[in-house]
Amino acid sequence: MPSCCCLLGLGFPSPPSALRILRRRMASRAFQLRLNPLTGDSEWLVVEEEEEEDHHPTPPPKQLLATTSYLDMLNDSARNRAYRRAIEAAVTDPSSRVLDIGAGTGLLSMMAARALAAVGGETRGGSVSACESYLPMGKLMRRVLRANGMENRVKVFHKRSDELKVGDDLDSPADILVSEILDSELLGEGLIPTLQQAYDMLLAKNPKIVPYRATTYGQLVESTFLWKLHDLHNNEANAADGVWLTPGEMERIVSVKPQQHAMQCDALEDEIRLLSEPFKVFEFDFWKRPDSHREANIKIQTTRDGYVHAIISWWVLQLDSAGSIFYSTAPRWARQSSSEGPQRDMKDWCDHWKQCVWFMQGKGIPATEDQVLSLRARHNQTSISYQLNINDEACDRSSKGDHLTLLPERIALYGDKDWRSALINTIKNALTVKSSPTCVVADDSMFLALLISSMSPTSKVIAMYPGLRDKGAAYLRSVADANNFSIDQIQVIGKRASSITADDLKHKKVNLLVGEPFYLGSEGMLPWQNLRFWSVRTLLDSMLSEDAFIMPCKGILKLCAMSLPDLWRSRSSLKDVEGFDHSVVNETLGACGYLPGDQQGPCLPYYVWQCGYTKKLSKVYSLMDFNFSEPIHSCFGKTKIEFSHDGTCHGFAVWIDWVLDERKSVVLTTGPDNRYWKQGVQLFGKPVEVNPGKSVMHVEASFDPSTGEITFSSSSTTCS
């Protein structure tokens, strides 16, 4: 985020009065970075803060907050209830000074203010201060406070907690700290440095802390699916197609990042073999200043033979000092086990806190029943890492310039035999009619650059690599010999399409324009944001030969009606949250269900297979075609859905099938049955009870080429 001094550093002295005015204006605005899905360019949005006396503030832009996890958190009743009980237990002194760091909508602050009032704090000098650095959320918090008559009982600071100062912002050090700066790994949102700074600068001696303690747990598992998510080398060896993304002696040149990866592991329960009981890893005592780094050596006795492919981890939060209020992110099988410790309340499915997966390298670590394995766990200020069998030090290329880290799903896709075969056969057919072609890889595909270069020694391959850039070039140099091509065949330009000129192509016409499509950094976006490939093709239109081969040649928007009760509940509109009205946040946070007028929540990206209980209620329908032989243009489509199963329809899943070769019907589908892709999920304004032969639904969609967005509308009818 640009700072005031950055904008003032123009080389001209500013008069003191102008400086004060600009500083005041900068203090009341923030800049939100947004990625344009069709160009890959970053765009700045300005978020203004209203003056204190403005009692009718403009809500923050919907798109800024609708894709966050705030709504899911506020629908997590177990979490809300646990925090309320713990705060009420902590606030017993009417003179308490409460500080809420990372206040969000202000829910915890309002709980503290209510608890303070209950013990007479309003007349005894008690106070509540809320710190929220993200201005769009801070604006929303002020609306929530006003809706609940709390605007004068909670003091709001749009600052990071390390910018707060006792004496300037806070009248005196706080003696109660409440916070929820936790992620699925526990530490990833900066919990430790935030608490350290608070203990050093903002808190009184011996403060009360909510939550009081957290304990992390782990469990050794065997899972073919999890193995495929990280072991590219052995999976592409099984494919045996001659293309080596990870040649011998370079097994780790493409890998997942060595970190904990958040995942809904309950969805894998039936295909996971547990190789150990749950074991305790670290205990974090928040009631005292936390350490930055620690290490633990743990002995784990295995419970059966198998290969350790991963460690699944979770945490248990103790919110009160008495040890009576807990919240757990454990998977279902561990919550049902008594070995974890005190019984935890069963809770609803939620998406904001998942379990985490730490992958073992290669084929996994072999284990026999009752074997004792040594695990070394380390944590720093923001993450926890593991090393199983301490003497088994693996080669780590991560510091080398040719090493690439990808998301687990991309690793699995690159090792998938069917996916590779579809691309190989399509490119092979294209090259039979192209002599010494000039080929442009229009995305960040390493696979296609290697494939074409190795299949066609006379080809000239121009890899755009707008995300990989120099790292992609270094990688290709490292694996060229193993794939039997000269690196001189490939030119990595590292540019977006809007910056490419005929000079970059040596004034040659492009015979092949190909993509997976895959754009580094865009993996979590909605499926149609990969239509960036269509935008690139349009920008390169004048550089294409008349008979240019384009792959994929078409995208088909598909959809399927779904029952999604767990996802619906987590995204449903809010009313009362532990006694506080949150209805003002619904539109901004993208809630669904029973909203005024025809409002509906946004279409959001999810791995549908991880969305709790799901059921398909219809067959798959085609809704819209995108023809890449033409320049990008607006599109419209509609279809009638006839239901094949009884149930409650909460919305539909939508995705794009990529047609690689229309003549040979080579299609890559990315629907819910394919677990390596996210789908878009459009939830309805109200759930609909459906019956085969009696219920139909009409769905329309339109694509706007200027924004890359697709909008949906739907209506249902019941036949007598």
From Swiss-Prot:
Keywords: Methyltransferase, Repeat, S-adenosyl-L-methionine, Transferase
Disulphide bridges, residue numbers: none
Organism expressing this protein natively: Oryza sativa subsp. indica (Rice)
Name used for this protein in its record: Protein arginine N-methyltransferase 7
GO molecular function, one term: protein-arginine N-methyltransferase activity
Active site residues per record: 180, 189
Pfam entry (one): PRMT_C
Top-level division of the source organism's lineage: Eukaryota
Occurrences of domain SAM-dependent MTase PRMT-type (ranges): 54-385, 387-720
PROSITE patterns: SAM_MT_PRMT
Enzyme Commission designation: 2.1.1.-
Function: Arginine methyltransferase that can both catalyze the formation of omega-N monomethylarginine (MMA) and symmetrical dimethylarginine (sDMA).
Similarity remark: Belongs to the class I-like SAM-binding methyltransferase superfamily. Protein arginine N-methyltransferase family. PRMT7 subfamily.
One GO BP: methylation
Classification via InterPro entries: Arg_MeTrfase, MeTrfase_PRMT7, PRMT_dom, SAM-dependent_MTases_sf
